[in-house]
Amino acid sequence: NPHESIPLNTVINDNFVNDNSGDIMITLTPDEVRARFGPLFSMKYLVMVDHNAGLAEIREHCRARGTIEWDAANRVRAKGAIQSCHVEGTKMTMLARLGVSPANFGAAGKEIGGQALEGVEVVGDEVVTTWSGIAGAGVGVAACLPQAPGVTRAEYPSEEDLRIGGARVCRVRIVSPLYEKVTIGIDDTDTREEGATWVLALKCAEACTIPGVDYLDMRLVQLNPAVPKKTTNCVGSALNFAVRPGKVDALLEYVRDFVESGAVSNDTGIAVYRGIAFAEESPYLKRVKTEILTVDDAEAEAARMGVRFIDSTGRKGRIGALGALLWGNKGVEAAGLYGETL
């Protein structure tokens, strides 16, 4: 059967023969996929891996909101490798387990998804994700997603998987560069007279041109407005980056130099976490929005959570920097007071 899943630990190349079907594995670059099917709609595809957590984070961007929403709903329903999925407009962020995970895949139904992520594997400095889609969802995985900027190549088990549309089933392995996730929290770069931490943080992110570093997003994190020592609104900033192997040190040196050279405060704090998920949720999430904390509190919790500080001051900015980092991937509620939702 040409549509049986291929083990993710199989070495695949242009001359690979699928033992189950006798078909040659067909490998196409994004340009070749585009030439075959015409330009479609995927705008970005990127995969970060956290080996310690056994997770991958997949970022996908499409020109249309409807396709992102339908794909997300069906991938979650199919289960497979997906642990969770979050949609913001035309962008999707998926958390997925590493390894092969059987999916409830087929024509969309009560417990069946018309599109599925069946596996995620790291091979050297690349990540291989295995996808299935039926009918229009097959067009998505076989013709649209493989064109996305960020894809290295697509591997199809057979010619049948390149026959898209109608009621056909398509399967594909999408290969992309391996990234890790780096989250950076920044606070106390300004004073009551001048400066704005969010402006400096965003300028830092957008000015980064290090090869192998991809700026993902930033969040403003509301800290406790009742603290006595603050500029005005008491807001920290968090930056998220996808980073290729061997590029983390260059990124951290760049961020520290940019932020500290642009800061007008002597209290600046910069906190860093490498990874997609923490081993446990930190009580500091609530405390930094509701209590008055000390630098010792922040440093102790950072050490416990695997967070390190790279600032040169060692002063009170570390409190908000850690808070911003911990909230940096929590969603829009990061911008509100504790318990406040939009």
Residue ranges of predicted features:
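N-terminal amphipathic/basic-hydrophobic helices that include classical n-h-c signal peptides
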Residues: 1-24
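Conserved mixed alpha/beta catalytic, RNA-binding, or beta-rich assembly cores of soluble enzyme
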Residues: 22-342
